[in-house]
From Swiss-Prot:
SMART domains: UreE_N (SM00988). Involved in urease metallocenter assembly. Binds nickel. Probably functions as a nickel donor during metallocenter assembly. One of its GO terms (cellular component) is cytoplasm. Belongs to the UreE family. One of its GO terms (molecular function) is unfolded protein binding. InterPro entries: UreE (IPR012406), UreE_C_dom (IPR007864), UreE_N (IPR004029), UreE_N_sf (IPR036118). This is Urease accessory protein UreE. Pfam families: UreE_C (PF05194), UreE_N (PF02814). Keywords: Chaperone, Cytoplasm, Nickel, Nickel insertion. It is found in: Cytoplasm. One of its GO terms (biological process) is protein folding.
Amino acid sequence: MIRATSVKGQHRWSEAAADTVVLDFDDRHRRRTAMVGTRGLQFLLDLEHAVALRGGDALVLEDGRLVEVVAAAEPLIEIRGSDPKELVRIAWHLGNRHLPTQIMAKGLRIRRDHVIEEMVQGLGAKTVEIEAPFDPEGGAYAPPAEPSHDHAGHDHAHDSHAHHDHDHGKHAQHDHGKHDHAHHDHAAHDDHHVHDEHCGHDHHGHGHEHK
């Protein structure tokens, strides 16, 4: 099986992609795993270190071909406060519970969880259930961003949406709506979010982890 051994960051490549992989937040945090593109290309992601992939990145195959990474839409809750102070207070409570949180210009996004949604509403915020790519903060202990060069094994900061127009085809849906906030140590990939821990959730599709 051909391997993908390095990553090109968003806006650092312009070639036509040989295929596309549509991945949710968890599946974008891998070091070594088998993947299948939307057009059927099978390959092994085999990086030196786990990388926080973003939508618009490209995985570089051994033969030089590229596979574009697209961030899959996930069931999320968007939190909107009446003022910045209220949002900061809510963000503190979310961080205190080790919840991955995406910071928006005028709100916060977390994975859909009705218990947390009720807590946030009790703090005075408004919530809206949405389907969107999830790109939470990397956390204080995440490696520094390195967007200026191609890399294998480094995180990078840029927008979570793909930058090419094409048909992504059918892909597995990921339902992270129900979870119990248990914290797991995923051996095959690093955590890259607030407090560097994940809430418990299932992984579906995109092959199996290889140790």
